[in-house]
């Protein structure tokens, strides 16, 4: 069981392939990902995720 303790999956770079990124992480044994916001919009997006 692995935890990614600092990820920016809320960044625009992941808009098109977010699900694939998460699935690849799961396939490698990552069970939890902490998404970090760096401004108000990314904080809101982190909460959504």
Curated annotation (Swiss-Prot):
Hydrolase is among the record's keywords: yes
Domain of life the protein comes from: Bacteria
Protein name: Uncharacterized metal-dependent hydrolase in metS 3'region
CC annotations in GO: cytosol
Cofactor(s) recorded in Swiss-Prot or TrEMBL: a divalent metal cation
Keyword hit for Electron transport: no
GO MF annotation terms: hydrolase activity, acting on ester bonds
Cofactor note: Binds 2 divalent metal cations per subunit.
Matches recorded under InterPro entries: DNase_TatD-rel_CS, Metal_Hydrolase, TatD-like
Annotated disulfide bonds: none
Enzyme class: hydrolase
Keywords: Hydrolase
Family: Belongs to the metallo-dependent hydrolases superfamily. TatD-type hydrolase family.
Assigned EC number: 3.1.-.-
Source species taxonomy: Bacteria, Bacillati, Bacillota, Bacilli, Bacillales
